[in-house]
């Protein structure tokens, strides 16, 4: 899959064809040693978004895609912050590449969801880096989904080692809280203040058209619910630390 956005067109389009699927993937951690910490953090959270959105997919999962998503989440929780702090560590770089590969395999089968649908609009309209957009939007959308995703998020919470006791709701909420905490520790903002009020109707139109029926989302958004999420993304910008961009 690839993406294209012409200079005169702010809509981010997906290009998908079997001919674009690689026969081999070369995972060489030495190629990522020079990746800046900021980009390491946001691309790692992008991989986490791939894994989680694939895992909570409503219909398209297989046993293999579920397993790969679980393994990706575990690897990312164990290695991303280490890669952010110690970019020269080839082992954690290798683990993150494996995690990204597994998450990519999972979402190629099971799809993504509303996080990506909204993130793509921000990339097209404001040139927001894709990983940064996903990192900020992911916990907000997961909170909005609520009980619809508690059982699966509770399972991921256990796998990630965040919390192993309590109810599904408690574990799911702890998992989401840890995503927020990971973002904060890596200097990723809580929200975006650049989303213009006049752009919101277009954002909603594009996001809804992409997510439904293309993605097997656990919660199908209407315009009002999508607007609520976008309002939250904007409101949370007030909580950003001074160093956050």
Predicted features by range, described:
Residues 110-174, 180:
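C-terminal catalytic subdomain
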Residues 153, 163-245:
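C-terminal charged capping/lid subdomain of soluble metabolic enzymes
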């Amino acid at each position: 899959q690839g993406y294209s956005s012409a200079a005169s067109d702010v809509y981010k389009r997906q290009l998908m064809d079997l001919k674009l699927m690689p026969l081999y993937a070369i995972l060489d951690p030495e190629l990522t040693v020079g990746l800046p910490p900021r980009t390491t953090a946001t691309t790692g959270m992008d991989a986490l978004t791939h894994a989680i959105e694939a895992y909570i997919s409503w219909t398209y999962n297989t046993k293999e895609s579920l397993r790969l998503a679980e393994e990706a989440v575990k690897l990312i929780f164990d290695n991303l912050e280490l890669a952010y702090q110690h970019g020269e560590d080839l082992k954690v770089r290798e683990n993150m590449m494996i995690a990204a590969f597994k998450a990519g395999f999972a979402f190629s089968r099971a799809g993504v969801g509303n996080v990506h649908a909204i993130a793509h609009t921000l990339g097209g309209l404001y040139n927001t880096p894709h990983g940064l957009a996903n990192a900020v939007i992911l916990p907000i959308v997961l909170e909005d989904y609520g009980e619809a995703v508690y059982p699966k998020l509770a399972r991921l919470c256990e796998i990630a080692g965040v919390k192993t006791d309590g109810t599904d709701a408690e574990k799911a909420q702890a998992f989401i809280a840890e995503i927020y905490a990971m973002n904060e520790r890596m200097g990723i903002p809580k929200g975006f203040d650049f989303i213009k009020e006049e752009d919101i109707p277009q954002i909603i139109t594009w996001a809804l058209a992409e997510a439904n029926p293309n993605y097997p989302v656990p919660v199908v958004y209407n315009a009002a619910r999508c607007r609520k999420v976008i309002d939250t993304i904007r409101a949370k910008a007030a909580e950003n630390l001074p160093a956050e961009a």
